């Protein structure tokens, strides 16, 4: 006798693995680099995206509510995490630069803007490698 039940809906294709905070941040930084924001002179938007992405990465990686903190408050909180002091200082300096452009009208040279994006990506790489090294040492 044929079965009258509908096929089970629980047999779904597996969902792709979630992207790591490191990969997600680096992907956003690549998108910013590929955007035409600098060519269009949209420095405020360029720096807004850098700052937002870096804060989001820090929040996900280190469990710190980075979006709700000033750079100096963030530096104090990061000192209590596994992030190195050097990386924390670099993150704070980059976020301060972002705020200077967004809110104080600072207009950096194109080379400086490109370097700031590279600095944000380097912070992600440094903290990613440092965290991986801690796991393998233990």
Locations of the language-model features?
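Hydrophobic, helix-length membrane anchors
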Residues: 1-45, 128-138
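Non-catalytic alpha-helical coupling and interface elements of nucleotide-dependent molecular machines
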Residues: 34, 55, 59, 125-129
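Generic structural signal for well-ordered, non-membrane alpha-helices
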Residues: 23-30, 52, 56, 76, ...
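Generic detection of long, well-ordered alpha-helical segments
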Residues: 40, 44-48, 110-117
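Cytosol-/stroma-facing membrane-proximal "stalk/adaptor" domains immediately downstream
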Residues: 80-138
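Alpha-helix initiation and N-capping motif
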Residues: 22-25, 71, 88, 117
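Short, charged amphipathic alpha-helical segments flanked by flexible coils
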Residues: 42-97
């Amino acid at each position: 006798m044929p079965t009258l039940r509908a096929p089970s809906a629980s047999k779904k294709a597996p969902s792709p693995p979630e992207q790591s905070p490191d990969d997600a941040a680096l992907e956003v930084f690549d998108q910013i680099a590929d955007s035409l924001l600098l060519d269009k002179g949209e420095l405020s938007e360029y720096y807004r995206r850098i700052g937002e992405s870096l804060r989001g990465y820090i929040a996900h990686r280190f469990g710190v509510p980075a979006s709700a903190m000033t750079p100096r408050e963030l530096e104090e909180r990061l000192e209590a995490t596994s992030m190195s002091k050097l990386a924390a200082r670099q993150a704070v300096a980059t976020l301060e630069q972002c705020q200077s452009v967004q809110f104080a009208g600072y207009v950096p040279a194109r080379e400086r803007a490109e370097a700031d994006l590279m600095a944000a990506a380097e912070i992600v790489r440094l903290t990613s490698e440092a965290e991986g090294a801690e796991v393998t040492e233990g």
